[in-house]
């Protein structure tokens, strides 16, 4: 479909061009939900695996376990996406063609002997007899470690093999095991003395977007982990406003996202919040002023958790870029810090009233954009922290909120992990195992498992790859398998339990739950011209905007579709239709 201007009934409709297709698994947003290229809704339900952000520049615990074993079991256990924290320093090294070499401190890797060899007695010693762990991560001699960039490419390939999707999270400017405590995305030196600037941060992410633009295993980029700092720190703290100040996270994220999408318009852009925003408590309050004991000028939140600024200063990207935005707050429980909203006998409603709604939940509820809770998790204390985890888990399930649990690793002091320990034996190597036995925190996994995307009756885990099922043990499905064989029958736990028609409409055995309008001569939002406005129209919007050549939209359909008054048929129109379907606006307000 060529870009241009189409005139219908006196309305100039500018058709938005889309980039050439670079894979069939890229995702985009309409309202608060994510969809695939066919207009089918998807749900990202995954976990974090950190280590690339650290001095080892490699996901942790590959010093104890085989990567293939770990990822296979992660997939078999239903995790359909992994958030990989990384440092700007590591990305810059890769960009400059100077990746560090892996070391034994970060990974145990060997293939000994590297080839079959004569045992000296007329027999053969098979390759790998004396050592076969992470063998793809050493050179042909079976012992020299490869570099960190090649290692990540291998890890990404294994994710693809098992139907797992991934995205990178810039966790800190510098490679440091405690780098996350630094406030900003710029202003720290690399080991070689190079200062990580805002421009270098952007350049390294654009380089990564270019490198992986043809591999939809890597779905997108979390631009910066937990921008934070107290308001009274002024320019040393991340803020969210309409300025062009370097510490304005909203401005920096906009510049970075636009640059990434110029290279790969299909990538998802995950944008976290800040720590504090201005409260407006008193006239004349300003960012950087001293705090007050009462009537504070600042509203606090978790690091990266404060997205209040989106209401007044939403991220606005070039072209159709807003369709790639996913806002990504972090949320934790009292075992990390006993915040004021945990002081009472809290419930879902008190958490919404005291913190969640105005801080981030409104973005989902008001159909502004999708959410992905990039970090949540904690210790199983049998008390307040566990209660909070269960409440947040159920809220995410019931409100189609994407999430990545913190974390797989066992070595997160604040939270612990889903893994408990590992053992490896060369004697256990077979066609289905490289010898790793993985022990899980089964009680924590059981709590978390309910939030994984799965079918309602058979409990099949649903992957995000159209062709490759999630895992190999028969418990997982590809996206095509789910929509062909399960969506219209048993459905899934998305939205707390839904059955979907093959066109993506939510149904129950007795009735549809979509909102329909009375047929009119000019039916705003009715892009498919079936005489009503329903979720089916939103699906057609998705496919049209993505330049799906199998969908047909007539001139009258385009006239109906333009509801924002800007003469452009794009995701803004689809969002407005979703707001109408959710009863946030009337049909009269749907008209441009």
For each predicted feature, which ranges?
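The substrate-binding groove and active-site-proximal loops of carbohydrate-active enzymes
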Residues: 53-60, 111-149, 183-199, 227, ...
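N-terminal export leaders
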Residues: 1-3
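Structural recognition of the beta-strand scaffold that forms the well-ordered cores
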Residues: 42-51, 80-86, 90, 165-169, ...
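Extracellular glycoside hydrolase catalytic/binding regions
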Residues: 63, 192, 202-220, 224-401
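Cellulosome-associated attachment modules in secreted, modular CAZymes
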Residues: 7-16, 505-592
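N-terminal carbohydrate-binding accessory modules
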Residues: 13-83, 94-122, 139, 485, ...
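Aromatic-lined substrate-binding rim segments of carbohydrate-active enzymes
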Residues: 59-177, 211, 248-265, 385-404
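Substrate-binding cleft of secreted/luminal carbohydrate-active enzymes
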Residues: 353-504
